[in-house]
Structures are given as C-alpha cells and as structure tokens.
Amino acid sequence: MVRTRTQGGGGHPSDCWAGLIAVAQDIDADMNTLFKAASLAYDVYHALFKSSNLRDKGIDNAFYVTVSTAVGASFLLGLSRESFAHAVSLSVVPNISLGVARTGRLSMWKAGASANAARNGVFAAIMAKEGLTAPELPFSGERGLFQLSSMFDLNFEKDQPKIFQAHMKSYLCDYHSQTAISIAIKLHSKVDPAQIEKICISTYWFAWNEVASDPSKWQPSNRETADHSLPWIVSGVLLDGDFGEALFTSERFNDPLIKDLCSRVEVKEDTELTSLFPNRMPCRIKIFLKNKQTIEEYLDLPNGHPDFPISDGDLNQKFLKLATQTVSSSQAINILNHLQHMDLMQSSRKLFDGCLVT
C-alpha cells in the first residue's frame, strides 16, 4: 500500500482506501473510477498536510483521512458541486481528531483512529448525497477550523499525482524507524550484543519526537507503544538480525535480554540531520563496545522512499511474509496473483473474489 506522507509531520493517506473500496463496491464502480477517487483523496490529503500542519495545534493526522476520504467518496458517488461542498463540511465540522492518540504509552485506539476517520468520511459523503446540509464556511467561518489552526491556503501542486510521492514501508512499524532498522540489520553481523556498552542513535527532530521522546519508549508493554519505539526496535533487531512480529509478543516485553539492551540506548536529535528532513530520513547509529571499540553506520534513505523506491519483489515478499501469518503459503500466493491484476478488473466488486479463504 502507498502508505505514508512525511512532510509536515506524518500520516497515512492509504487509510482512505478501505472507505473508498467500500463505497466503490456498494455502487459497483469500475476499478478505473476507484483509482481516480483514490488519487484525488491523496491530492487532498497532501494539500491539507502541507498547508496546515495541524499537528502543531494538537490535531491528529486522522483528520486528514476524514476529509480526503469524504472527497474521494463524493467523487465516486457523483455528487453535485453543492452536495460535494456539504460533504467536505460534514467531514470537517464534527471530526476534529486529537493527536493525544499517538503520544505517551499508546493505546489500542492508535490503530482505530484512522479507520474511524475513514468511516466518518464515507458517512459525510453519504449524508450529503441524501440531502443533509452542513455549515457553509467550515474553515473560515466564525468558530470554524481556522480559529483552531490559524488561516492557511490549500495549495494544490500541479505536477504529478501525489500518490506517486507517498512512501512505502518495508517494515510494519512507524515510518521514522525504517532507516534505523536497515542500519541495525547491517550492524547485527558486526557486533556481539553481549559486548555492547552503549548505543547512540542520532536522528532528525521529528523522528526523535515521534519515536524516542517519551520514557515509555524504553519500557513498552504493548504492541502499540513498541512499534513506535526506536530504542526497542533497534535493540530487538540488533539481537535478532531482522525485524518481525517476534519483537511485539508479551513474552518479549518481559525478556530481560532486550530490556537490558534497550536501557543502553540513547537517542538524540542531530540538528544537521534535522536540516535534511523531509527530503531525507537520516539516521546514524554508533555502538560503543566494552573493549572500547566503536562501530558506526549511517543511512539517509529507507527502502520505499520516493527517491529509493521499493522493488516489486521486496513488496511481494513483504505481503507474503505478513499474509502467511494468517493463511497458508499457497493461499497467500493466490491472493497476491489476483491482486496484481486488479487494474484489469471491470468491476470493483471483483477485487476480493480471489481473496476468499476456505
């Protein structure tokens, strides 16, 4: 899935897809129309994201999902200009999501916030289609969004569709840990974890703030916190040599080996690295060994960045690795083969025909 936007703070425009697919299948839209709706949703997400930076005002990126899903769904439903405007207003006015969902010791709601947002975006479009009216000036009106955010202009850049500039994750965790994971995998073959005295991770400010600024990141007790913990993830990969679900089991959260190594991790912002963000996602890991030697690695582009695109082969392997946790290998391969030809499907209702598991 084309997953993440990084400029301005963070977020996942791909969270719009489930809502858009639901609408498309309900009205039996063709796949080409669904793709157009998704591209439009990404463009709106990007424009909001770049123009407003609502994160600084305490508003979660799930808000962008609500608005962009409403726009994509309105396109699918063929709303008139007037109804389209009501759908946007209905997505904005009742749906201010708070960023506290992604701070401190994270809860299960972190995983539900954007799904709820997409659902609300679909609901806004459906209600507008049925004739429900909404405030005419949701942004600039009295007590509108601008009173919370300050005024901003939506700038729609006219180069290529923004879906092509979104980032893909190689690893199923926060995007700002992706570069560090690749470094840690490389370092695993060079160090004996038992000989590590200290691990110093230098990164850009946003990565530090997102995945290493809270004490809970050093003592995660659930998946939600652990997969947004840079010290935990790096410690686990240094021990295991790879990234996987084994890092997020209840047994692992009580493993004294990884807990001890995690306690030896220091994460700090490097202003030089901050200056490279968001065009680069730089990270430097320096390991201090008990024999006084040091080992250091640096990387500034994770696999899946628009300037370092993930290959089809790597993407397929990621899908199969995740899918086979739920279905058999043969079933996963069949599903993958089916989805790889979705652009040839006439009806969006055929999208899941090859995904049925018996």
PLM regions with names:
Residues 1-30, 37, 44:
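Function-dense linear segments that define catalytic or interfacial modules
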Residues 1-9, 106-119, 126-358:
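Terminal-appendage/accessory-domain detector
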Residues 13-15, 63-66, 311-316:
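Short acidic alpha-helix initiation/capping motifs at coil-to-helix transition points
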Residues 14-21, 65-72, 118-123, 177-181, ...:
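Well-ordered alpha-helical segments within folded domains of soluble proteins
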Residues 23, 74, 187, 191:
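Hydrophobic pocket-lining residues that define ligand/cofactor binding sites across diverse proteins
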Residues 24-117, 130, 137-142:
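Glycine-rich, mobile lid/loop segments that gate access to catalytic sites or pores
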